[in-house]
Every structure is written in C-alpha cells, then in structure tokens.
Amino acid sequence: MLKNDDTIVAIATPSGYGAIAVIRISGNNSIKIIKKIFCSFSKNQIETNYIHLGYIKYKKQIIDKVLIFLFKKPKSYTGEDIVEISCHGSIYIQNKLLSIIIDQGARLANPGEFTLRAFLNGKIDLCQAESILDIVNSETFFSHKFAINQMRGNISLLIRKLSKEIINLLSLIEFELDFSEENCNFINYLEFKKMLYNIIKKLKTLIRSFKIGNALKNGISVSIIGCPNVGKSTLFNKLLKYERSIVSNIAGTTRNYIEDSLIINGIKFRFIDTAGINNNTKDYIEKLGIKKTYSKINKSDLILYVFDDLNEKFILKKVKSLQEKYPKKKIFIIINKYDLIKKKIKEFNYKKIFKISAKYGYGVNNLLSEITFFSKKITSLKENTIVITQTRHYESFKKAIFYLYKVKKNLYSISPEFLSIDIRTALDYLGKVTGEVTNEDILSNIFSKFCIGK
C-alpha cells in the first residue's frame, strides 16, 4: 500500500531567486510544526481560513517575515491539514525553512506527492490528477482549455455514464446466469446488441478525438524535408522568425533534425528541420540523419517538401514516391529560391504548391496562412466536445472496445459466463482511466512526472 500517514514538505514555486517563494506542508503534524516556529504579529491563536503575518523563528533567530495560510482537513488540496508559507524568494531562506521543517518531523515530498495524496484521499480522480499536470504544462489556449475541462471532471462524468451502461449489460448477463438451470432466455438479444453498439459508438468517438486532442495539446507536427541544400534550414528559420538552424551552402550541413515551436492563434506548431534526403550517400552519419528524417515524416501531421528547381517530372515522381510510402500524410510542395528560377510556373498538376524565397521571405506568409488553415481542418471541434489528450486514456479505451467487440462477436456462440468475463474486463479498462482500478506502477508513472511541490 502507498503510505500517506506522515507529514511532507516541499518548495512549491520554481527553483531560483524570485520576489517570493511558497513552501507547502501537508499531513497530520503540519499545523503542529508551524505553531512551533511561527510567531504571529497579532499574538492571537493561529486560525484556519485566515492569512497570518509574522516571523519564522528558530533557535531564537529570525529567519524571515512571512505570510502563512492554514487549511484544515478535509477542506484542503490534499484532504489533509495543509500549511503554505509565503516567504521571500532567497535561495538561502527557502532551503533554511525547508531544513527547519524537516528537523521538526516532516520529510521531503516526492514528485507529485501532494496531488497523489489528493487522489488517495478522494479529492480528485486519476483523470483529474493528470489534468493538473496538463494545466501546469499548458502553453496554448487549447491545451489549457482541454486541461481545465478534464480537471472539472467532464471526462470522468462521461466515463461514469459509460460504466453504468456497461454495468447494465453485465446485469442482464448475470441475470441470465442466475436462471441458467431454468432453460429460459431472459435476454432480448436485439435490445442487448443495440445497447452494446451505442456504448462502442461512444467509445470510438472518444478514440477519434485523441488525434485532435493530442495535436492541440502537444502541437501540430510539421516536417520540412527535401534534398540537401534546397533551403530547408533557411525556411525553418524564416518560419520561426529567428536564426535557429545553421545555414550553409555546403550540402549536408544538417545531419540531425532540429525542432522548435511557434504558437499561432492559440495553436502550437512544432516545426522540424530535417537532414537532407540523399539516398546515394555513403556517409554513415548522413545515413543516420536520413533515417531520422523518415522517422519524423512518419510522425508528422504535415510535410513541407522543399525543391529548388522546376523539373515537374522529377518533383511529382518524388512526391508520388513519398505519398505511396505515407498515404495518409498531407504534403505541401515548396518551390524555394523562386527569385533565382528563370522558368516561371504556368501550370503545375498538384493541389498545394507554394512559390517562395525563404532567404528574402517572398511567399512565406502565404505558406504560413495555408499551414494555419490546414490546422483548423484537422482541429475543428463542435462546442462542448469532449476530447481526450492522454495516451493512457486512448489505450484504455481501445482495450475496452476490443473486449466489447468480442462480446458482440460471440453473443450467440458462447456461454453467458464467458461474455460476463469480457464485459467485466472492458469495465475494468474504463476504471483504469479514473483510477477506480489501478496499481502502484501506474500511479508511480503518472505522479513521477509532477514537480516536487505539486
């Protein structure tokens, strides 16, 4: 069992110097500890739900002038007694206060342990716990919006409704089992299949939402690819509006991919400058770079295929070859160095082709507008749509659907006892999302990603 009966302490604010810092204590002895070291200016009893001004004193020495906040269980973040100390942001003061509180019987918290205790004490479910980390890490309007919705319990509520529907299916099967000796069928199998189909349909909608949710949370991946020395790095820098990648007229300068982000209209884009594709190279390092390029292409939402000439047959051959290898990928053809090309484009048999000069910026804004427009098509959502952003949830929902499909397939061919096992397994996978069914390994993996003070 996970132990949570002692008192923990941690610095809750980012490390380093600052105007203020916050130190958080949680556990049965947190208020007892603060009463030993805090001298209130008001000389009154330290009460909960009030802010108190005073000194932290230790061995007759004043350490700092602080504000303290007391939260009595169960009305606190962790469901335990909590004290938060707001002190000056000196590194010495922070470490000294931490040391004093540990001397008084607390121990240093593990990463995410405050939120873990909130989960163990029933203040939040596992889905909401993950959303807190997402809120802390949110960089854009949409990543913040999804995290807030998850924290409010929107996904948890939907899972509870789906679980209830699955329990109804299970009840029908169990009822059939209870009266199996009567040689009577109590299940209306047509109605049962209809209920099963509706549950699967809702789960599939959640699974489909993951592509959108993941893109909006982690960023839309845009890989810039092409032969060596066609201007990929120059375009990469121009899109980011600063010199992020080394630019040289020597072919093969970029041996590894370089990635950086840009936020446009609340959406995060992850632009990736890749190694030039030279299938004839004998250079081992260059081959490794090209291998990574193809790996990035496979994971990209959009590919910018850069060329620096107008050989239509060559270009379409290259694009067709890539499209055959990655049939679901969206590809934009980029004709770079257009200012140097004497033969101008009249017609070109491809939907998305952009004439640019990455060096001088010609056509880059138009390209950026099209990239933004593309993002809207893959991220368009109806108002109040529930979207999943966690890979863990996605995998659990896929497993739940797998077992429900087994029930659908075997409905008329196997004993209700075996159908019951598959339905229970599907129910368990939904329970894993909210933490109703879990183990210590899952909890450790989730909460280890938090900072120590959270």
UniProtKB/Swiss-Prot annotation:
It comes from the Bacteria. GTP binds at residues 229-234, 248-254, 273-276. Mg(2+) binds at S233, T254. The keyword Transmembrane does not apply. Exhibits a very high intrinsic GTPase hydrolysis rate. Involved in the addition of a carboxymethylaminomethyl (cmnm) group at the wobble position (U34) of certain tRNAs, forming tRNA-cmnm(5)s(2)U34. GO terms for cellular component: cytosol. HAMAP family: GTPase_MnmE. PANTHER family: TRNA MODIFICATION GTPASE GTPBP3, TRNA MODIFICATION GTPASE GTPBP3, MITOCHONDRIAL. It is an enzyme of class 3 (hydrolase). GO terms for molecular function: GTP binding; GTPase activity; metal ion binding. PROSITE patterns: G_TRME (PS51709). Its EC number is 3.6.-.-. This is tRNA modification GTPase MnmE. InterPro entries: G_TrmE (IPR031168), GTP-bd (IPR006073), GTP-bd_TrmE_N (IPR018948), GTPase_MnmE (IPR004520), MnmE_dom2 (IPR027368), MnmE_helical (IPR025867), P-loop_NTPase (IPR027417), Small_GTP-bd (IPR005225). GO terms for biological process: tRNA methylation; tRNA wobble uridine modification. Pfam families: MMR_HSR1, MnmE_helical, TrmE_N. Keywords: Cytoplasm, GTP-binding, Hydrolase, Magnesium, Metal-binding, Nucleotide-binding, Potassium, tRNA processing. Homodimer. Heterotetramer of two MnmE and two MnmG subunits. The gene is mnmE. K(+) binds at N229, S248, I250, T253. (6S)-5-formyl-5,6,7,8-tetrahydrofolate binds at R24, E84, K123, K454. Binds 1 potassium ion per subunit.
